[in-house]
Amino acid sequence: MNPFRILGDLSHLTSILILIHNIKTTRYIEGISFKTQTLYALVFITRYLDLLTFHWVSLYNALMKIFFIVSTAYIVVLLQGSKRTNTIAYNEMLMHDTFKIQHLLIGSALMSVFFHHKFTFLELAWSFSVWLESVAILPQLYMLSKGGKTRSLTVHYIFAMGLYRALYIPNWIWRYSTEDKKLDKIAFFAGLLQTLLYSDFFYIYYTKVIRGKGFKLPK
């Protein structure tokens, strides 16, 4: 069993549970990017279309895929539902969530056309999801950079998401050295890009949060 894969999945699962717990128990959505959460829902829906073929690698793999689709969609529903339960917070969230995601969608679509394993619908959808996931956090980071401060649980959520992607780099190295000696270059370089996007956040998280100072991204 690949320990880095398990740790990465646990970190990802933890990040989602942190966010759901935050929204459900406090109804506090300030600092959360609705656009990033919508992109993540799109990422997992397009990535795991192979569930419809019923060619599952393992029960664990299938259950994790279903969880990520359902949970990310549920987060979007919770955020959208705040329009009715907390109208002021919902409007403020949208007002600050101004990153133009059409650039990310078009860029990911183009990358999937140029970089894919096979020119089939499922493979193109998978490649699109990988490239989109690598940049889906940008609206959230952009929102934080504009606002400067945010709720600590949101910061911990972003850290857990970044850790999940960072752990997938040693996961690919482990698989290359112990399995078939084949490196999935699309997943590797997209994951590397995503980890680099988190690098500034990781540094500030360590210097400000871990060391007990207030969190604030540079504008």
Swiss-Prot record:
GO terms for cellular component: cis-Golgi network; endoplasmic reticulum; endoplasmic reticulum membrane. It is found in: Endoplasmic reticulum membrane. It comes from the Eukaryota. One of its GO terms (molecular function) is ER retention sequence binding. GO terms for biological process: protein retention in ER lumen; protein transport; retrograde vesicle-mediated transport, Golgi to endoplasmic reticulum. The keyword Transport applies. Pfam families: ER_lumen_recept (PF00810). Its main location: endoplasmic reticulum. Residues 27-37, 80-98, 140-152, 207-219 are cytoplasmic. The chain crosses the membrane at residues 6-26, 38-58, 59-79, 99-116, 119-139, 153-173, 186-206. It is a multi-pass membrane protein. The keyword Membrane applies. InterPro entries: ER_ret_rcpt. Residues 1-5, 117-118, 174-185 are lumenal. Keywords: Endoplasmic reticulum, ER-Golgi transport, Membrane, Protein transport, Receptor, Transmembrane, Transmembrane helix, Transport. PANTHER family: ER LUMEN PROTEIN RETAINING RECEPTOR. Required for the retention of luminal endoplasmic reticulum proteins. Determines the specificity of the luminal ER protein retention system. Also required for normal vesicular traffic through the Golgi. This receptor strongly recognizes H-D-E-L and weakly recognizes D-D-E-L and K-D-E-L. Belongs to the ERD2 family. This is ER lumen protein-retaining receptor. It comes from Saccharomyces cerevisiae (strain ATCC 204508 / S288c) (Baker's yeast).
